[in-house]
A protein has these predicted regions:
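Active-site core segments that coordinate phosphate-bearing ligands/cofactors
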Residues: 1-194
Length: 194
């Protein structure tokens, strides 16, 4: 979503410039449901589509950009909450790739998820993860943890802050009400789209 917003909608590749005027993290009243291709886990609704919510005549480009970043983070939080419901408590996560280079994106994500993020040295997460799993399968390492301990290097750590995590927790509660309110609408529109 972040790349789509920047490149396809704003027609820029200068991500840093677009982020420099975003200043009031945790207080944006514009929401974005990032369901550009439906939504997978944990909602599993192929008819869901992206929506901006809460815009007014005063809404700025910066608020919309911030809403896109926050919406992606809130959608990831949906998956973290699903894991919690299964008894899995996630306290830290690695981040990599283009988005991980942005201090603002890491700050939003760390505080929305309320976990420590470690930016990894290797930017090719999926391919590198596949190589790690292959190394374990071939017997080079006894388990995934051992392989990761040896191969994955952290270059930056981003910690949540209590104040910002609280603001984002409140915003996540509001975000969580939007999709259920639109579920029937998504379904009806999907029937007419097919």
């Amino acid at each position: 979503c972040n790349k789509w917003w920047m490149e396809d909608i704003l027609k820029t590749s200068d991500f840093a410039s677009e982020q420099k005027d975003i200043k009031d993290l945790g207080n944006n009243r514009v929401y974005f449901l990032p369901y550009l291709m439906g939504e997978r886990s944990p909602i599993n609704d192929p008819s869901a589509r992206a929506v901006f919510f809460g815009m007014s005549m005063d809404t700025t480009r910066e608020q919309m950009t911030q809403a896109v970043f926050e919406g992606v983070a809130f959608a990831l939080r949906d998956s973290v909450e699903a894991a919690k419901a299964l008894g899995i408590n996630i306290v830290k996560s690695g981040v990599c790739g283009g988005g991980a280079k942005s201090p603002m994106w890491r700050t939003i994500l760390a505080n929305v998820l309320n976990i420590t993020l470690e930016q990894t040295e290797n930017e090719e997460g999926p391919a590198f993860g596949g190589a790690i799993l292959a190394a374990v399968a071939c017997g080079e390492y006894p388990d995934v943890k051992s392989a990761c301990d040896k191969l994955v290097k952290s270059v930056k750590k981003t910690e949540p802050t209590p104040e910002l995590a609280k603001l984002y927790n409140d915003r996540y509660s509001e975000f969580s009400k939007i999709y259920p309110s639109l579920k029937v609408v998504y379904s009806d529109i999907s029937k007419n789209r097919d």
